[in-house]
Amino acid sequence: MSSSIEIFPDSDILVAAAGKRLVGAIGAAVAARGQALIVLTGGGNGIALLRYLSAQAQQIEWSKVHLFWGDERYVPEDDDERNLKQARRALLNHVDIPSNQVHPMAASDGDFGGDLDAAALAYEQVLAASAAPGDPAPNFDVHLLGMGPEGHINSLFPHSPAVLESTRMVVAVDDSPKPPPRRITLTLPAIQRSREVWLLVSGPGKADAVAAAIGGADPVSVPAAGAVGRQNTLWLLDRDAAAKLPS
């Protein structure tokens, strides 16, 4: 397992570099295993990356790509807060990916209504169905992540029950400190099944958490510290986010 850091002048250059790398990673996964399993993230950089992929759509063999989500806001299907809705606008409406290879999390006005726990369990079943027999989740090729100023990733917040989860792949979050409060999230054990984990982080408000996570903080306190890939962990930072790393 390796870990590396790349620093860029600004978030636009960061996103373009991440997008170019992801196009290559998808191609390599398809060549090696016949498919590419990618976990998407929301946030400014995550959605900008999807717009980059849309512009480079001809370089990707979409019939071989499966898309998952690291977390989702448990709001109605058409709510602008939905990561899925943002992903549709940025990418999915513009590429020819089979609908059964897009694996979104449930919405609050969907099959499970207000039952957040049932929605989380259902996504665990989605992951298991996409995994090798007997495995709880796939070995994702790339899990994309953003990070909050306190070090949260997906909807795993510091000192929360979700970040403490050690066995389940997906859990419900009903008291997120960042609105909306009700969410579904992949856990650290699910993230750690990924071959590669990429963290795209920009802005001066993230510098302390970046330094803590890379410096080996307890993931309970800084969840991003637990975002580790089986083969590679890649931090893609702008200069502001990297400002407090040792020189």
Curated annotation (Swiss-Prot):
Single GO BP term: carbohydrate metabolic process
Enzyme class: hydrolase
GO molecular function terms attached to this record: 6-phosphogluconolactonase activity
Metabolic or biological pathway: Carbohydrate degradation; pentose phosphate pathway; D-ribulose 5-phosphate from D-glucose 6-phosphate (oxidative stage): step 2/3
Catalysed reactions, semicolon-separated: 6-phospho-D-glucono-1,5-lactone + H2O = 6-phospho-D-gluconate + H(+)
Enzyme Commission number: 3.1.1.31
Hydrolase recorded as keyword: yes
GO cellular component terms attached to this protein's record: plasma membrane
Keywords linked to the UniProt accession: Hydrolase
Function: Hydrolysis of 6-phosphogluconolactone to 6-phosphogluconate.
Family classification: Belongs to the glucosamine/galactosamine-6-phosphate isomerase family. 6-phosphogluconolactonase subfamily.
Listed name of the protein: 6-phosphogluconolactonase
